[in-house]
Structures are given as C-alpha cells and as structure tokens.
C-alpha cells in the first residue's frame, strides 16, 4: 500500500538522493531566456510588418502603373490612325474646301470633328500630344531629324515639327520628330 501511495504522490524527500542537483532551473536564467525570446519575436514582428508595408506600397504602385500604362501598346497603334487622319485633312487646301460642294464640306467637317474627338479620347486615357515648336530641343522628348541654319532663334531650338510626339503618364509613347536650329545665339 505504501508503494501505491508513493506512486500517486510522487517521490518524497526520502527517495531523493542527498547532494543531487535540484531539478528546478534558475529563475534568473529562465527570465533572461524569455526576455531574449521576447526581443527576438518583437524583431521578427517588426520586420514582418515592414515587409507587409513594403509589399502594400509596391502593389499599390503596380496597380497604379497598370491603370496608367495598361493601354500603352494599344495607344501606340492608334497614333498611326491619328497621324493618317491629320495628314488627310492637311492635304485638302483651304481654297479647295471653300469651293467644294456642300456634301464634301460636310465630310471634311465630320473628319475634323472625328480628329478632335479622337484626340480628346486619347487624353482621357492619359495620352498627351507633344507639340514642341519653339521649345528647346530635349532628347528625352524629341527626335532630331535635321538641323537648319537659323540665326533668329537660339541654337538648339525646335524650328519645325515633322510629326508630333506623345506621352502617356510620365513615359514617352513616341518622341516628336523635329528640325532643330543651328547657328543662332547659345540657348
């Protein structure tokens, strides 16, 4: 019966050998270990929170870029349409328009309206026209096709626009093709 009682209550002091080390760890060591673990977990938490914030910012930027630049290839293809429409209208001389029959005049007016409407729709999607006539040449926005001697304007000024350029957001969709002055005062 004593054996049963000892098994239920665990070993008593009489069963523990004299001089054996105590089984309980030092409370100061336990405290130091817990503080170190706490510091480590806080550090991991702060790093995880920072990673999540960076991921959120990066995702927001990617979504904004997708909205802004998602139509880039389509818009670039549509520029050919805009150029052709503009060239078609530019090739009808003003006197021919004035002498044209009313049906032809209505057709020309309809094409002009279509050109303006198309340009406004491009702008609605963030595509803006670059018309740099009279501005200083900027290789980021313009493509110089030729230089032209012109003493009346500063050197490096855009004197002629062969084909307008376009930007979408902060990016160049197509640089403006221009002629640049040479020989004037430094600009």
Swiss-Prot record:
GO terms for cellular component: cytoplasm. GO terms for molecular function: adenyl-nucleotide exchange factor activity; protein homodimerization activity; protein-folding chaperone binding; unfolded protein binding. Pfam families: GrpE. The keyword S-adenosyl-L-methionine does not apply. InterPro entries: GrpE, GrpE_coiled_coil, GrpE_head. The keyword DNA-binding does not apply. Its main location: cytoplasm. GO terms for biological process: protein folding. It is found in: Cytoplasm. Gene3D superfamilies: 3.90.20.20, Head domain of nucleotide exchange factor GrpE. CDD domains: GrpE. Residues 1-26 are annotated as: Disordered. Keywords: Chaperone, Cytoplasm, Stress response. It comes from the Bacteria. SUPFAM superfamilies: Coiled-coil domain of nucleotide exchange factor GrpE, Head domain of nucleotide exchange factor GrpE. Participates actively in the response to hyperosmotic and heat shock by preventing the aggregation of stress-denatured proteins, in association with DnaK and GrpE. It is the nucleotide exchange factor for DnaK and may function as a thermosensor. Unfolded proteins bind initially to DnaJ; upon interaction with the DnaJ-bound protein, DnaK hydrolyzes its bound ATP, resulting in the formation of a stable complex. GrpE releases ADP from DnaK; ATP binding to DnaK triggers the release of the substrate protein, thus completing the reaction cycle. Belongs to the GrpE family. NCBIfam families: PRK14141.1. Homodimer. This is Protein GrpE. It comes from Methylocella silvestris (strain DSM 15510 / CIP 108128 / LMG 27833 / NCIMB 13906 / BL2).
């Amino acid at each position: 019966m004593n054996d049963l009682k000892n098994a239920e209550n665990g070993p008593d002091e009489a069963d523990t050998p004299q001089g054996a080390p105590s089984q309980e760890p030092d409370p100061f060591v336990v405290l130091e270990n817990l503080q170190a673990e706490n510091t480590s977990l806080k550090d991991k938490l702060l790093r995880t929170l920072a990673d999540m914030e960076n991921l959120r910012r990066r995702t927001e930027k990617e979504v904004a870029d997708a909205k802004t630049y998602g139509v880039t290839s389509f818009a670039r293809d549509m520029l050919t349409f805009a150029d052709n429409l503009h060239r078609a209208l530019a090739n009808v001389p003003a006197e021919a328009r004035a002498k044209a029959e009313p049906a032809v005049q209505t057709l020309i007016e309809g094409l002009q309206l279509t050109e303006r409407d198309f340009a406004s729709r491009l702008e609605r999607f963030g595509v803006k026209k670059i018309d740099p006539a009279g501005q200083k040449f900027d290789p980021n926005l313009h493509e110089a096709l030729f230089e032209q001697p012109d003493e009346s304007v500063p050197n490096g000024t855009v004197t002629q626009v062969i084909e307008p350029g376009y930007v979408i957001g902060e990016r160049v969709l197509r640089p403006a093709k221009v002629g640049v002055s040479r020989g004037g005062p430094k600009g």
